[in-house]
From Swiss-Prot:
Job of this protein: The glycine cleavage system catalyzes the degradation of glycine.
GO-annotated molecular function: aminomethyltransferase activity; transaminase activity
Reactions performed catalytically: N(6)-[(R)-S(8)-aminomethyldihydrolipoyl]-L-lysyl-[protein] + (6S)-5,6,7,8-tetrahydrofolate = N(6)-[(R)-dihydrolipoyl]-L-lysyl-[protein] + (6R)-5,10-methylene-5,6,7,8-tetrahydrofolate + NH4(+)
Keywords carried by this UniProt record: Aminotransferase, Transferase
Designated name of the protein: Aminomethyltransferase
Cross-referenced InterPro entries: GCS_T, GCS_T_bac, GCST_C, GCV_T_N, GcvT/YgfZ/DmdA, GcvT/YgfZ_C, TrmE/GcvT_dom1
Native source organism of the sequence: Synechocystis sp. (strain ATCC 27184 / PCC 6803 / Kazusa)
Alphabetical list of PANTHER family matching this protein: AMINOMETHYLTRANSFERASE (PTHR43757), AMINOMETHYLTRANSFERASE, MITOCHONDRIAL (PTHR43757:SF2)
UniProt subunit comment: The glycine cleavage system is composed of four proteins: P, T, L and H.
Family: Belongs to the GcvT family.
EC number: 2.1.2.10
Length: 372
């Protein structure tokens, strides 16, 4: 039977399929898993520079009066700390404090009419859900523009990202801090450029029209930038201790459980959806926590593998891989708070057998070249 909902394709699909046939469906989109090979792509980003088509990500632009004030009631982070040209990584919460999605809020200042302009980047698989939630909770007078299928988004990541991108724009990108962003002229078009990424390295995410996006992909390729797929994107983010929505967090886990307590600013902001639950958890503690894990054997702990203590199932692995950089099997998983201390030894069940695993810091790898 034919698929009634065929996978979506990004504007770069034809260019990408000239470079690889290794594709998969992710978040409703047909995306490349790898090009030359996962290890080669991973190493390129860690040591030089790689590029990712991330056009499948959701892209919303909100315009109107008091846009940030309206968003304040939907996230636990204090958006009053934002200034034009800066961004905040945060989460949308439901009434139970569960994470609807993790997002980035970009404050683009005011337009010539004096209206606030805010860009939101959200996960591909949750774009429809997020849009519905936002439209239900934001004031009607705020203009909501969904550019998810209208714009290309390319991530240029790695220590040489600045060297590659700088000659293409007039502004001094070296002065842009982490989570800083600006609009720059590129091929006679305004490009949105942010110093953000999902790899643990320095890098930029560039949003442009499909026409310019195709030229940009080809330009980067001509400069020797390695095209990278979802496989390397996953190993890179896991080494950097970055959670993946739908695996490491979902609408039943709170930010305090998911290791995102630094996003919760209870003392400096007013009410927001889910505040009561987070206030209670902050006061009394959480029952489970997302932790970093390192295998003591050569096995790899994968998503949904049970975590045991003294033979009893106590938790679950949410993400796991063999780290190309560290040459160790690493993972993220939820365990009871009393078993979440660094150094705690546990077991994981792999295909019916148990192997040793220990709790470590979630930041498995830290780049020395990434701007702070």
């Amino acid at each position: 039977m034919a698929n009634l909902f065929p996978a979506l394709r990004t504007p770069l699909y034809n260019l990408i399929t000239e470079q690889t046939t290794k594709l998969t469906t992710f978040g409703g989109w047909e995306m490349p898993v790898q090009f030359a090979g996962l290890k080669q792509e991973h190493q390129a980003v860690r040591e030089k520079v790689g590029m990712f088509d991330i056009s499948h990500m959701g892209k919303f632009v909100l315009t109107g009066q008091k846009v940030l004030a309206a968003l304040q009631s939907l996230v636990p982070s204090d958006l009053d700390r934002l200034t034009p040209g800066k961004a905040q990584y945060t989460v949308l919460l439901n009434a139970q404090g569960g994470i609807i999605d993790d997002i980035i809020v970009y404050d683009q200042g005011k337009n010539p009419e004096g209206q606030e302009r805010v860009t939101l980047i959200v996960n591909a698989a949750t774009t429809v859900k997020d849009k519905q939630w936002l439209l239900e909770h934001l004031p009607e007078e705020i203009d909501f523009q969904d550019l998810s299928r209208e714009k290309v988004l390319i991530a240029l990541q790695g220590p040489e990202a600045l060297t590659i991108l700088q000659p293409l724009v007039d502004q001094n990108l070296g002065e842009l801090p982490a989570f800083g962003h600006l609009e720059a002229e590129f091929l006679r078009e305004k490009a949105f450029i942010a110093r953000t990424g999902y790899t643990g390295e320095d890098g930029f995410e560039i949003m442009v029209s499909p026409e310019v996006g195709k030229q940009l992909w080809q330009t980067f390729g001509s400069k020797g930038v390695t095209p990278c797929g979802l496989g390397a994107r996953d190993t890179l983010r896991l080494e950097a201790g970055m959670g993946l929505y739908g695996q490491d967090m979902n609408d039943e886990t709170t930010p305090l459980e998911a290791g995102l307590g630094w996003l919760v600013h209870l003392d400096s902001k007013g009410d927001f959806i889910g505040r009561a639950v987070l206030t209670e958890q902050k006061a009394n503690g959480v029952e489970k926590r997302l932790v970093g894990l390192e295998m003591l054997a050569k096995q790899i702990a994968r998503h949904d593998y049970p975590i045991l203590h003294n033979g009893e199932i106590m938790g679950i692995v949410t993400s796991g891989t063999l780290s190309p950089t560290l040459q160790k099997a690493i993972a993220l998983g939820y365990v009871p708070t009393e078993l979440a201390k660094v150094g705690q030894e546990l077991e994981v069940e792999v295909r019916g057998k148990t192997y040793g695993i220990k709790v470590v810091k979630k930041l498995f790898y830290r780049s020395e070249q990434k701007p702070r």
